[in-house]
From Swiss-Prot:
Keyword Nucleotide-binding recorded: no
Keywords from the named record: Membrane, Photosynthesis, Photosystem II, Reaction center, Thylakoid, Transmembrane, Transmembrane helix
Organism expressing this protein natively: Prochlorococcus marinus (strain NATL2A)
Residue ranges of coiled coil: none
Membrane topology: Single-pass membrane protein
Subcellular location: Cellular thylakoid membrane
GO biological process: one example: photosynthesis
NCBIfam families hit by this protein: PRK00753.1
Entry protein name: Photosystem II reaction center protein L
Keyword Membrane recorded: yes
Cellular component GO terms held in the UniProt record: photosystem II reaction center; plasma membrane-derived thylakoid membrane
């Protein structure tokens, strides 16, 4: 078994992924609410 030479890489990638998922969720919610209000 090999030790990961850069242990800080995985949390950064995880935070970036969660950030993109949060932005996508806000984007989808904005579209749903705008379509709800404009109908």
């Amino acid at each position: 078994m090999q030790v990961n030479p850069n242990p800080n890489k995985v949390p950064v990638e995880l935070n970036r992924t969660s950030l993109y998922l949060g932005l996508l969720l806000v984007f989808v919610m904005g579209i749903l609410f705008s379509s709800y209000f404009f109908n």
